[in-house]
Each structure stands twice: as structure tokens, then as C-alpha cells.
């Protein structure tokens, strides 16, 4: 947040130099004066402001839990991308356990590949069958004065997981899919 504050101190607004952040979300904006941040952007796989039935249910469940447990901020409960990712992960694990009919890790791991879940993003997330990374949508949101985001761009659907960046020299020759013929140690 100090970076944004300094931009404001220098008289630079989002209309002059828009900044795209990859780690600023609803929780980071809680309790912060968002006026100087309005118009800056963030890229995530989920924003609380998304409008769809799955997100409405997700926010309602979280608000009830936060109130019941008397969590800090329960009077104005927030959801964010890391929470949505955890929520998806727990449900996919549950589905994999049910498919494997076991809690045994060696049985659950192969069962998790290919799992799908209608996520709070409004899209169906998918666990890649080979590398176990999620296929998820991408959203770009513009910071609003109330600390929420207005989605200004989104992918038409989930983006296939690419676990190794080709832009990092050490990763350029890494395979996105594990070698299933390699022997376990």
C-alpha cells in the first residue's frame, strides 16, 4: 500500500499511471483510505463483487460463519481470492475422497485429477488430470471507493494451468506434466 500512497503523494492518479497489482485484494483494502487507489487494477481468479448464485451462496455462508465464530470484521465480512481457492480445494478433496472411497493419500491423489467444481467465480474450476493444477478464470478488477472491485475484463472461461513459466530460464525445459513412468523413491 505504501507504493500507492507515494503515487498519490506525487500527484499521480490511476488515470495517469494505472498500476496492475497481483497481490492487492479486498482484505488488503479493508480499513485503508481507498480514494487515492480508485481506478488502479488488480488481477485475480476471484473478486467478492462477482454477481452469480454460487458467489452469493459462498458470501452468505462465510458471513454466517464469521458472525457465529465472532471473527474480527464479522460485521462487514469479506471474501477474497485465497479464500475462494481454499474453498474449491476442500470441495475437490472431498469429491476425490468420495471417488477413491478412502482417505488413503495414495488412493486420493489419482482420484483428484479431473475433479470439477462450480466455483464462486461463476465458472467451473477443473483439476488438471496430469499436473493437478487448477484451470480457473482470470479477472481484472478496478478498485472502487468502497474497497471492492469492478470487473473490467475476464477470460471467456477457465485458463488451463501452466505450472512452469517459460520466462524463467531455469523453468524453460520443465515439462508441465509429470513423468508418470519415473519410479517412486
Predicted segments — roles?
Residues 1-185:
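Extracytosolic ligand-binding ectodomains
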Amino acid at each position: 500500500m505504501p507504493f500507492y500512497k507515494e503515487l498519490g503523494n506525487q500527484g499521480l492518479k490511476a488515470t495517469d499511471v494505472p498500476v496492475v497489482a497481483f497481490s492487492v485484494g479486498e482484505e488488503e483494502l479493508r480499513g485503508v483510505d481507498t480514494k487515492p487507489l480508485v481506478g488502479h487494477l488488480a488481477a485475480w481468479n476471484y473478486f467478492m463483487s462477482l454477481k452469480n448464485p454460487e458467489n452469493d451462496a459462498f458470501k452468505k455462508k462465510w458471513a454466517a460463519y464469521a458472525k457465529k465464530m465472532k471473527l474480527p470484521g464479522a460485521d462487514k465480512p469479506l471474501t477474497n481470492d485465497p479464500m475462494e481457492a481454499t474453498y474449491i480445494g476442500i470441495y475437490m478433496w472431498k469429491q476425490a475422497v468420495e471417488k477413491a472411497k478412502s482417505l488413503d493419500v495414495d488412493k486420493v491423489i489419482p482420484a483428484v485429477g479431473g475433479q470439477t467444481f462450480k466455483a464462486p467465480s461463476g465458472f467451473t474450476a477443473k483439476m488438471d488430470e496430469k499436473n493437478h493444477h487448477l484451470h480457473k478464470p482470470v479477472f481484472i478488477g478496478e478498485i472502487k471507493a468502497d474497497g471492492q472491485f469492478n470487473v473490467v475484463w475476464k477470460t471467456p472461461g477457465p485458463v488451463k494451468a501452466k505450472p512452469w513459466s517459460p520466462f524463467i530460464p531455469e523453468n524453460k525445459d520443465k515439462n508441465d506434466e509429470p513423468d508418470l513412468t519415473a519410479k517412486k523413491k
